[in-house]
Amino acid sequence: MTKKQKKTLKRIIAAAVLTVLLALLFHFVELPWFVQLVLWLVPYLVIGHDVLRKAFMGIKNGEAFDENFLMAVATVGAIGCGEYAEGVAVMLFYQIGELFQSYAVGKSRSSITALMDIRPDSANLEAEDGSVSVVDPDDVPIGATIVVKPGEKIPLDGVVLTGESTLNTAALTGESRPRTVRPGDEVISGCVNADGVLRIRTTKIYGESTVAKILDLVENSSLKKAPVENFITKFARYYTPAVCIGALVLAIVPPLLLGNWLDWIMRALTFLVISCPCALVISIPLTFFGGIGGASKRGILVKGGNYLEALSKTGVAVFDKTGTLTKGVFKVTHTTPADGVTEADLLESAALAESFSNHPISKSLREACPGLDAKRASDAQEIAGHGVKTQVDGRTVLAGNARLMESEHIDYTAAEGAGTIVYVARDGQFLGSILISDEEKPTAGTAMQGLQAQGVRTVMLTGDAPAVAELVAKDLGIDEVHAGLLPADKVAWVEKLLAQKPEKKELAFVGDGINDAPVLMRADIGIAMGALGSDAAIEAADIVLMDDDPAKISLAMRISRKCMRIVYQNIVFALAVKALCLILSALGITNMWWGVFADVGVMILAVLNATRMLNVKEYQ
């Protein structure tokens, strides 16, 4: 609890004790009305002086119609009608509800504050003479050398100069997978250095670092309100004056016709207590705040409640392939040696033949067969569109596509697979084929199933060859695929899909944020995946996934849909209970105690329901 909340709790306890004592006193002792009034005013002012002050200031500033005004009029009116205990009790329960609401908001803010803990407090700046001084991260320039000790947060983005360590990225990604860094590796701010001492050369000032951008994004997320939040705010602006006029009419018109002024005034005051819109005005923003906070704990950064609401309406999810559904790293995934040839001989021959090439395919072959002596290869000849011809240990080795085998009159066995096939021959003899492909991410298939289970149609757009794209789409269970696309073609396809999408449904585009900025901004919801350290992704996207896990997309959608379910539950529940109690109040069936339940009770239940968004465990 905060200091202010503790002070309010003490006032509530003091007022509650005084109320109970006075109720017992007047049960056994008969005292004049003016003595009772003076005694009841003590607990009333202890618990309600701040509400009265706020109501007065609201009237003074021309903003009278709020919950403070409603409570002040209702309780002062009840005391004026001689219902001292009810007037004090209404104010007491209202303050209990306000304290509960304040505590719930504080709890939801703490989920954001936990993310705020990634902000580094200081940086160890190394001078030219080797001395180290502790400075504010804002004071560290680009190109400076900082020292990060074990257990400390990396304060600024940079490159490791010396040292080797393991970084904990859990605060940024929501996952506790460690990452090993060595000299030459890039590191980003907000990660925790687990073991070794690192010397880092800074590449950005603090204001432009990853951690500063993330904090700015989360802190400003509450400014972008969801349409339903804006509706509730506008609703309350007209609703409160309307119920005040209704209460005034209820207090004046019926007694002019039927008499019994005191009874109708009490009905009108109960009407005011019931009509307070606290349950909606507080619980709806709290639900969105809790949803954004809960998502941030899992490494899903949502830029505002409007994007969370839009995500819940997603009907079509469009994916880029490379780097989003696949790892974007070429790797030897399958080998088919010819009869009498070992896999080791096949890979070694191909790796040595490709030892002079910088092509990604060549690199993947060398990685599959590390530790080879490149001096064994010589006279490498690259044949455009075919492959390479290299002398290895004095023998001619060919490595390339089917056209190379045919042009060199090699009797080869054709192979099939989702990726690039490299055929290898030595001195005219076919050695076998090697399949090199972009490896699918382990959770990509699960992510597609999760989205389809939520009624979302999945589409993949890629620049890859149709055969490769079709195999990946079939393997992952994607509904629709369009291949061989240039970046401009992807934008055109998104435009087409936007025109085809069902009414009241949204289109989400998921990319790695590197070449996808135009499409991310054109889609209804742009989701950048693997944005850890990617400025372009954080800027262009509406929702940012800090790691490379496609399953987070399905998770984000579940969070958004749960958020909207809770919002609509609270709206229906609050309006239904209040409408019923308002009718009963106008008919004289309910009293002020019913009003307390319809206001404070409904608010507490709605806030409790809203705080369910903070429970991220059930999303796992």
Indicate residue ranges for each PLM-predicted region.
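N-terminal membrane topogenic signal
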Residues: 1-16, 239
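Actuator/coupling domain of P-type ATPases
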Residues: 2, 23-27, 33, 39-126, ...
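Bilayer-spanning, highly hydrophobic alpha-helical transmembrane segments
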Residues: 15-18, 230-261, 267-288, 568-597
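Juxtamembrane helix-loop transition segments at the membrane interface in multi-pass membrane proteins
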Residues: 56-65, 100-113, 286-305, 611-620
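Conserved catalytic phosphorylation-site environment of P-type ATPases
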Residues: 72, 172, 231, 266, ...
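P-type ATPase nucleotide-binding
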Residues: 149, 332-457, 466, 475-494
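Conserved ATP-binding TGD loop and adjacent catalytic N/P-domain core of P-type ATPases
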Residues: 392-394, 420, 426-569
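Membrane-embedded transport module
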Residues: 501-504, 541, 546-620
